[in-house]
A protein has these predicted regions:
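Acidic/His-rich, metal-assisted hydrolase cores and their charged scaffolds
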Residues: 1-219
């Protein structure tokens, strides 16, 4: 028999997991205090659900002091559908810690202030709302999808933050932004990059060497 697996991090170990919740909370506090939005380009499957998990904790622990009732918009039909699949397939999609929450009647991906934008009209309305907010949208590398509209509306604002939570491949719009581009082209327009650019270091959906070997040993 043969087993074919991915091995992106097969030659290394991830090390201690950073405190992503506190990092995100810091970004939210800093940005909301200036009246801006936090725009998060996010992969629709896996990464968006992980961000929702973190954001639920931030809300529950009231970690955003001056704006605790902030709204979170998920603006990606695929991400919304994937989230529904996660919720319907608990045993396959969640780890033991998350299953414990579910057993207590807590949905780890739901919280007050979460808004799901399915239609194009709902998507457009997000940027007409001037209240500080979190916008989760795909694609994660900003090459396509609704995220490009949110970048167009927020990149030029010095009080907003673009928070990257995934790998940005060479040649992508996301890579250009994190490498310090001062302008980018969106929908035929040159958009100045004035927003604060942040990244979550070390976050990955790929298992490291230990995790890959553990998975193989269980077969």
């Amino acid at each position: 028999d043969y087993v074919l697996i991915e091995s992106t991090y097969g030659d290394r170990f991830h090390g201690e997991r950073p405190d992503y919740v506190n990092k995100i909370a810091t970004v939210l506090n800093d940005t909301f205090s200036k009246g801006g939005n936090v725009v998060i380009p996010s992969f629709a499957v896996g990464r968006t659900q992980e961000m929702l998990y973190f954001l639920r904790i931030i809300k529950k622990e009231k970690m955003v002091k001056n704006y605790p009732n902030f709204e979170v918009y998920v603006d990606s039909p695929l991400a919304i559908e994937a989230t529904n699949i996660f919720n319907k397939n608990v045993t396959e999609c969640f780890d033991d810690e998350t299953k414990e929450l579910i057993n207590k009647g807590i949905n780890p991906l739901q919280f007050e202030g979460l808004k799901l934008s399915v239609s194009s009209n709902e998507s457009i309305a997000i940027n007409q709302n001037k209240v500080p907010k979190v916008i989760l949208s795909a694609s994660g590398m900003c090459e396509a999808g609704r995220i490009r509209h949110h970048l167009k509306h927020n990149l030029w604002k010095p009080n907003s933050t673009i928070l990257f939570v995934g790998y940005q491949a060479v040649g992508t719009l996301g890579r250009s932004i994190i490498e310090g581009a001062t302008t980018v082209k969106l929908f035929g327009e040159e958009i100045a990059v004035k927003a604060k650019i942040e990244t979550l270091k070390g976050i990955s959906g790929h298992g490291d060497q230990k995790q890959l070997i553990s998975w193989l040993e269980a077969m």
